[in-house]
Amino acid sequence: MSGTFSRCMCTPAARVFWNAGQVFCTRCLSARSLLSPELQDTDLGAVGLFYKPRDKLHWKVPIGIPQVECTPSGCCWLSAVFPLARMTSGNHNFLQRLVKVADVLYRDGCLAPRHLRELQVYERGCNWYPITGPVPGMGLFANSMHVSDQPFPGATHVLTNSPLPQQACRQPFCPFEEAHSSVYRWKKFVVFTDSSLNGRSRMMWTPESDDSAALEVLPPELERQVEILIRSFPAHHPVDLADWELTESPENGFSFNTSHSCGHLVQNPDVFDGKCWLSCFLGQSVEVRCHEEHLADAFGYQTKWGVHGKYLQRRLQVRGIRAVVDPDGPIHVEALSCPQSWIRHLTLDDDVTPGFVRLTSLRIVPNTEPTTSRIFRFGAHKWYGAAGKRARAKRAAKSEKDSAPTPKVALPVPTCGITTYSPPTDGSCGWHVLAAIMNRMINGDFTSPLTQYNRPEDDWASDYDLVQAIQCLRLPATVVRNRACPNAKYLIKLNGVHWEVEVRSGMAPRSLSRECVVGVCSEGCVAPPYPADGLPKRALEALASAYRLPSDCVSSGIADFLANPPPQEFWTLDKMLTSPSPERSGFSSLYKLLLEVVPQKCGATEGAFIYAVERMLKDCPSSKQAMALLAKIKVPSSKAPSVSLDECFPTDVLADFEPASQERPQSSGAAVVLCSPDAKEFEEAAPEEVQESGHKAVHSALLAEGPNNEQVQVVAGEQLKLGGCGLAVGNAHEGALVSAGLINLVGGNLSPSDPMKENMLNSREDEPLDLSQPAPASTTTLVREQTPDNPGSDAGALPVTVREFVPTGPILCHVEHCGTESGDSSSPLDLSDAQTLDQPLNLSLAAWPVRATASDPGWVHGRREPVFVKPRNAFSDGDSALQFGELSESSSVIEFDRTKDAPVVDAPVDLTTSNEALSVVDPFEFAELKRPRFSAQALIDRGGPLADVHAKIKNRVYEQCLQACEPGSRATPATREWLDKMWDRVDMKTWRCTSQFQAGRILASLKFLPDMIQDTPPPVPRKNRASDNAGLKQLVAQWDRKLSVTPPPKPVGPVLDQIVPPPTDIQQEDVTPSDGPPHAPDFPSRVSTGGSWKGLMLSGTRLAGSISQRLMTWVFLKFSPTSQLLCSHFSRRGALWLQVIGCLQVSFYLLSCSVVLTRYSDAFPYWVSFLVLCGVFVWVFLVLGWLLLYFYSRLHPTQSVLLVTTIRRSVMLSFWLLSSANFGNLCAALWSAPQASYVSFLASYSVGHVISGMFSYVYACLQIWPFLLFMWCPRGVVTSVGESV
């Protein structure tokens, strides 16, 4: 480009512009030479070398001299003068346009969007395009801070009048706010800097390119700021560092950069939480906001930059709302540093957040609300959630000249080899993967030390569960999605439905951010080295103790274990398998061998064997002793016919299936006294031998008052055994003592007729209460009130009424025990660190460390066991409303259910209470376990519209569990405790519910219950009663038995011994337990009188009826084809008459046939013989149909049961019609016998029989024809048709 002369001859006041690195004059288009030094203006930087304005300009260029020639540092807008003039002018007005463009840009000393609008560049055919390739023709290249007439490193858009193939940006789009920057190169980055009029500078960086070598080198005084900029902010974001509070070290700071998890921004959870997008749901309920937050976190949409714009748009649509643009809206949309930023922020503050720019305001409206406002689109490439709330004041910038070096982050080492580990396919493969990672980091063995634990399909570990656990354990592992994080040493992959893990053997581990763990990090992410103490202590043991929980609870169990680990002095099974020790390898190998062999040969489950080993290693002080104990387990011989699990273990350690210990001797006595603290003299009642050898415990007992439910929790010594012990309750206000024997707590064992026990109780009545003894252990006595369905009651039923009145102080409880020491290992509760009632109870898994093993979900660490308080109205087989039955030592909860509207006994129990007791509770007081708010059991306890639904589900769980127990063991305490713990395991699946409607959906099918029962078998499993006669015969026999047995008459009073009816498919003899102690007192006729004449008469009547019914059924099935279905449609007496009539008419017909066939003569016409033979044929045909049906039902008992039953009913109905018609013929013949001869009598009977037989023959043919057709069909057709029917 050159004008008339080779060099410009114009005045120095003529404006200049840059083009292709050369300075030209706007008047003559000739190259401008350097001005003389006296004319140069140092305030204008590079422009002042070629241009001397007539008037002083109000803007300055901060970059001084010297600098590289032909680079308009700080004045990049000079390169935009020529392309703007050329693209917006013609051939004849180009010079005038060039002067006009120069005048506009020189006025402000920069290029801004307002200048483009003033020059009407868009109206003259120019558009902004994103740069996707080479740009032909004239164009103006730009990014957020810089413009140039030539492509440059970091350019993102181009302004041109050429019709490029890509989609043009929407107007009014402009990639920059002000373009007047300087460009430098530093390492592998290109840095842009500028200064505004107020002296505050902005900086931006972009990756380098091939043209970066021609740029100036970054000045040394800016290197520190550039390090902070690149580490803390993403590319193409012009940032003023004075708006941000910075830290010296980047390890603990925050970073917006996609390649760095940490930066120099001060980490503030209230500012950088990435959750500001939740402000769009402020109009919704708290449950909705919590659900949206959990959903974004669970599915990986939540990142440190927020959530994707399209995701937020979709969630608003799902909730029936949308965002509209409203200048007065409460929600303000901001962008990080520039409007083109992909990092957005939603705020409710009116002031602009420092470091952000305000874009617009919006409000949330329902989708159905008509509005004239423009709908706000959140954008497909925008992320909302940059900050949590606005900073109140602008943060002071740190010193820019601080020369403290930034710690360098090492790049990942290239991998040398990859090793893959595939864990066992037991449903817990995800947790085996994490265990293998930690086992390799600790012990160098890339295998899982965890034992196999079969999980149902709906409880497999998801990627969200694994991510949560990885973060809790701080593992250098990532979940591989589309790509693997380059900094992760361990890669967890999903192979179909199986989790596997790969290790990069030649790579050093690194600390990964959440984005890297989830697997959504960027290509060039950088992670700091993994610290030496990165893996928490006992991390592997924490996983081993929690991996048997439901998968969504494992991470919480790990966190609770690490927060409050149990004592480490004992070597448990998990510690032996996970902790480093000389015996670990041998113990693990021997244990896996025994686990594979012993349960199989003993016919036991693996869960039972694991639980037995855990019991054997309980309180083991050293690893050597644990190894020695494990070596004592005997492998049963293959020649032995049957070996129990107990025989394989040492004699001093039995493989007891019951979680509660049975070895401790029973307590010989106990006494409970409730009294007031202001009483001068405490009353006490206890057996004398208790005072001699027992230990004492004194605690406070509180009464939580309510309209229908008052609970008294008495914290006492060891487990309370009521059988054979004395229990007394005293009232200090009235000075009266009521013996619990008057209430018959143990079904007759402690009755008023026992004078010795009453004397023992009354003998200690006047002694004071000793408050000096400590409380070594505890049990819980729960007193509750319950209103029966029927207010009437038998005279023998013993009701209990508890009267209420408000006392003046708290109530003290004195409990005494004897027989064992306080340090017994079977003590149910350790209250050495108990909490007061006015403080929140610590319900973490560390304070209540339940470990859901395969055989015992309630087994705990540290010799502590949880108290499972069974809710009301949920009783198992043998339970009663008045649970005063004898309890074994396995019970840690004693329930007294009080009955309303019942007659008061002679000495009612008065329990005093006070609200003031809550503030002065004894520190040893024990509080009942609190379940999550929306768990199934909590919903049952809280009541409400869904309580009945969950109660029915609980009853179904109890019924299915009872079916797996031996009938005679269903009322034992061990079975009841197993039922409660099974329900607790089922209830655990609803602990993560966030709504009251989720628990019912999770537990509706109960598909997981059979596998759970198989993993955790009952104490006495149900035996296999299958025999050779199994099949349809057994099914039909059960059905006939249920139809034939008359239901017992309903009693007048309430039935107390059977709250939940037994399942309908259980045989009658299985309903009543045949062994074991009764769980509750039965009716007076069974308990008190026993052999009275009423009971004998009732049992005799039932026995006679059963014998007669079975006899008549057998006779009828042998000699008459009348359907048993009639027994269910007619009364028993009517069905009996029909059977007798059928037998009689068959006998008469056989008699007539014998007379005709044996005494044949000419007196009998041939047509009579023919009719008789036809009748015989009809009977034979129907009998053959019956036999075919019988044999087919035996050959195919399971394929077409419904089809066989339908045809059977039809054939039986045909026989019934034939029998009825023949009986009518017989009656008519007998009625006409005096007037007719012997021959005519037989002939008339035969004729009638043939007529009725032909009718039944046609009916039977129509019914048997489908049966004969299906007899010759293939099995598949029979099965499909049977299922369709």
UniProtKB/Swiss-Prot annotation:
- UniProt source species: Porcine reproductive and respiratory syndrome virus (strain Lelystad) (PRRSV)
Could you tell me which InterPro entries the record lists for this protein?
Answer: Arterivirus_Nsp2_C33, AV_PCPalpha, AV_PCPalpha_sf, AV_PCPbeta, AV_PCPbeta_sf, Nsp1alpha_Znf, NSP2-B_epitope, NSP2_assoc
Biased-composition ranges, Polar residues, are 775-790
Region annotation (PCP1-beta) maps to 269-384
Q: What is the name of the protein in this document?
A: Replicase polyprotein 1TF
Under which EC number(s) is this enzyme classified?
3.4.22.-
Sorted UniProt keywords: Host cytoplasm, Host membrane, Host nucleus, Hydrolase, Membrane, Metal-binding, Protease, Thiol protease, Transmembrane, Transmembrane helix, Zinc, Zinc-finger
Domain Peptidase C32 positions = 269-385
Q: Which GO terms describe its cellular component?
A: host cell cytoplasm; host cell membrane; host cell nucleus; membrane
List the catalytic residues: C76 (for nsp1-alpha papain-like cysteine proteinase activity), H146 (for nsp1-alpha papain-like cysteine proteinase activity), C276 (for nsp1-beta papain-like cysteine proteinase activity), H345 (for nsp1-beta papain-like cysteine proteinase activity)
- GO term, biological process aspect, one: viral translational frameshifting
For this UniProt entry, the molecular function terms from Gene Ontology, in alphabetical order, are: cysteine-type endopeptidase activity; zinc ion binding
Region ranges (PCP1-alpha): 69-182
Disordered: where is this region? Answer: 752-797, 1050-1088
This protein's record includes keyword Nucleus: no
Which residues belong to zinc fingers classed as C4-type? 8-28
Residues with site note (Cleavage): H180, S181, G385, A386
Describe the location of the Peptidase C31 domain by residue ranges. 69-180
Transmembrane regions: 1136-1156, 1170-1190, 1211-1231, 1250-1270
